[in-house]
Amino acid sequence: LNASGQPYFNVQIDGVATLSSGETVSYTSTRVRTWTAGSTTLLNRFDDEYDITGTAIGTFSSGGGYTALTTNPVHIKVGCGFPVSGTIEIAPQSRPLRIVDYGSGTCDATFTVTVNGQTYTFN
């Protein structure tokens, strides 16, 4: 349990994938998944909610890569099927920063991506 009494899981990934072209993609991620609701109703997974925080780094053998940082916890409602809030900054190497914003809590498939001050809405 964390300091707030919530169950949490540390998730670490360190892997490499080889594409059919022979190029490799390396991925390293360190995340914390905090169970914010539904932990006492083990037979009803649809009332579960999680906050996810952390970082990720991806690199390509042909050059380039990216880093990702959760700047506001990504909130998942299992019964919804989509992230409902949270912000991630994705910094591709030699490219502008991308800010992904999942909104303010509404269960919908809408999110925005901001690049160079331009915001694009996806749903």
Regions found by a protein language model. Name each.
Residues S20-T24, S85, G117-F122:
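An extracellular/secretory-lumen and virion-surface interaction module
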Residues Y8, F82-V84:
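Short, solvent-exposed linear patches
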Residues I13-A17, G54-G58, G86-I90, D108-V115:
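Short polybasic amphipathic segments
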Residues A91-N123:
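Extended terminal
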Residues G79-F82, E89-S94:
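Extracytosolic secretory-pathway proteins
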Residues L1-K77:
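Short helix-loop boundary/capping segments
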